Swiss-Prot record:
Composition-biased stretches (Gly residues): 21-35
Keyword Zinc-finger appears in the UniProt entry: no
Domain of life: Bacteria
Annotated protein name in UniProt: Large ribosomal subunit protein uL15
GO biological process annotation, one example: translation
InterPro entries, A to Z: Ribosomal_uL15 (IPR030878), Ribosomal_uL15/eL18 (IPR021131), Ribosomal_uL15/eL18_sf (IPR036227), Ribosomal_uL15_bac-type (IPR005749), Ribosomal_uL15_CS (IPR001196)
One Pfam family, short name: Ribosomal_L27A
Gene3D superfamilies with a match to the protein in the record: 3.100.10.10
Organism: Rhizobium etli (strain ATCC 51251 / DSM 11541 / JCM 21823 / NBRC 15573 / CFN 42)
GO molecular function terms listed in the Swiss-Prot or TrEMBL record: rRNA binding; structural constituent of ribosome
Any GO CC annotation of this UniProt entry: cytosolic large ribosomal subunit
Quaternary structure annotation from Swiss-Prot or TrEMBL: Part of the 50S ribosomal subunit.
Family membership: Belongs to the universal ribosomal protein uL15 family.
Length: 158
């Protein structure tokens, strides 16, 4: 068998159905759209329109809001910090902060700061400067001989 001898399986391909090409084609005139009405016209798709029935987005109640002042922290686990130290991407002797975590590829962007959570174990003795840390995370870092410095949140604009 050669590349030029390869053929599709029988019945696997279908020729395109050409619509609106005369009465003899079998799909001329209305081209499979039926007679009159909204769906026979061009540009029919009206997003969210359910034919006059109250649409789902109006049947369901409005809930909640997006707080524009909410702090958006990047969450980092102790396990990921330890993995970066083990891989040689983070220097345990240097101060670990948002810039160091970004340079090591642990986080992509700092947003409003970094929050450390206690998921996993930490063996390295590190000095970490972050915007937030959970109490168990602080305990684990201090148990390993490290220190945690929490940055004060920026004052809200008045």
């Amino acid at each position: 068998m050669k590349l030029n001898e390869i053929k599709d399986n029988e019945g696997s391909t279908h020729s395109r159905k050409r619509l609106g090409r005369g009465i003899g084609s079998g799909s001329g005139k209305t081209a499979g759209r039926g007679v009159k009405g909204q769906k026979s016209r061009s540009g029919v798709a009206i997003n969210g329109f359910e034919g006059g029935q109250m649409p789902i987005y109006r049947r369901l109640p409005k809930r909640g809001f997006n707080n524009i002042f909410a702090s958006d922290f990047v969450v980092v686990s102790l396990a990921r910090i330890q993995a970066a130290i083990d891989a040689g991407k983070l220097d345990a002797k240097a101060t670990v902060d948002a810039a160091a975590l970004k340079a090591a590829g642990v986080i992509r962007r700092a947003k409003d700061g970094v929050r450390v959570l206690a998921d996993g174990d930490l063996k390295a003795k590190i000095t970490i400067v972050v915007a937030g840390a959970s109490k168990p995370a602080v305990e684990k870092i201090e148990k390993a001989g490290g220190t945690v410095t929490l940055l004060s949140a920026p004052a809200a604009a008045e």
